[in-house]
Amino acid sequence: LTGNKCIVDTFDRNFQFNVEHVSLAKKADCVMIAPASANIIGKIANGIADDMLTTTVMACKCKVMISPAMNTNMYDNPIVQDNIARLRRFGYEVIEPDSGYLACGDTGRGKMPSPESLLWYILKETAYEKDMKDIKLCVTAGPTREAIDPVRFISNNSTGKMGYAIARMAMLRGADVTLVSGKVDVPPVPFVNIINVI
């Protein structure tokens, strides 16, 4: 569909002369492996670089995100959990799997998060310069209520859209955002601490 060659062979001689895994690693702003099987997690955690994906990841200097997806029993296996802990210690970001109906027919933890939620991880990492890093920001959004007496209150018709947009952009620019929100019909902003007040 893209017109680009899909690179799977580490040393494909029918392609341009480049050490592909190194050149791909240099081009990347971030890397996300989704879904990440127990096998690929184990290889990376233990420094095994025997295919195009693992050699590229080993050569990366950018942020690497791993999204485990597998059967619940495999995910909960102590060896897999130890490999995930090792990846975190090495600085990889491991995205927690969702719970739900799995491809094997079981129900439980190990489901890959939705593509939309994985996209937010990439956007958070690459969308904007992090010129608001180390800034703590509190944003208010939506309607509020001020009681007049035990029965009546004063409120407004705020939709919260502007406050949510500000919180989203500040998060993408690296700020640590707390969003104090009244009741709104706006989707929650990922990676933002939301405090509901109504």
Predicted regions and their residues:
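A cross-family phosphate/adenosyl-ligand binding-site feature
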Residues: 1-64, 71-160, 164-198
